[in-house]
Amino acid sequence: MRLVIARCRVDYVGRLTAHLPTARRLLLIKADGSVSIHADDRAYKPLNWMSPPCWLVEDTVEDAEALWVVTNKAGEELRITIEEIEHDSSHELGVDPGLVKDGVEAHLQELLAEHVETLGSGYTLVRREYMTAIGPVDLLCRNADGASVAVEIKRRGDIDGVEQLTRYLELLNRDPLLAPVSGVFAAQQIKPQAKTLATDRGIRCLVLDYEALRGTESTEFRLF
């Protein structure tokens, strides 16, 4: 991983355009090729990014120290004009073991993958643990119309889980082979605040009955 702290301005050119004026920012270049731009006030969410597969070319320009052009397979560009570099270091982190879900969440994922029709009539499973640049999506499915659906599974659904699914959706919807991608937030319990946030973002909520999925007597699934 390469860490660069620099005064820079950023332009995203593609299906959408976005501009970040000059400011001090953290630039992350990961081993998978992804590039992300971070400020000091947004916890974990980058200001902008380019997901792999993408390619970074560093060039020189007259009015700045460097110009980074990051291009993805769709031809979209993330153009980072660097006015001054304050820090530049590279670090080998090795292979990360990844986040280990607790037993119930892992079993819920397995059961829901086996009974994907729980999500709705006509649903089919594309893949469990669909890998993205920011982590694996629990389930990637297709609905009855053939549209992509990302499913995040929790034992207890809270706002953090909705934020996590939101990040996945933002990333997946940049892939022209998958877009448009909708989301389902599935959990045994979903807190009211999480439900409100999910609904506001167009994410469907599904309350899971663990015992019913395991084949024992219980109540029906509730969709809302």
Swiss-Prot record:
The keyword DNA-binding applies. One of its GO terms (cellular component) is cytoplasm. Pfam families: NucS_C (PF01939), NucS_N (PF21003). Its main location: cytoplasm. Keywords: Cytoplasm, DNA-binding, Endonuclease, Hydrolase, Nuclease. InterPro entries: Endonuclease_NucS (IPR002793), NucS_C (IPR048301), NucS_N (IPR048302), NucS_N_sf (IPR049173), tRNA_endonuc-like_dom_sf (IPR011856). The keyword Disulfide bond does not apply. Belongs to the NucS endonuclease family. This is Endonuclease NucS. It comes from Rhodococcus jostii (strain RHA1).
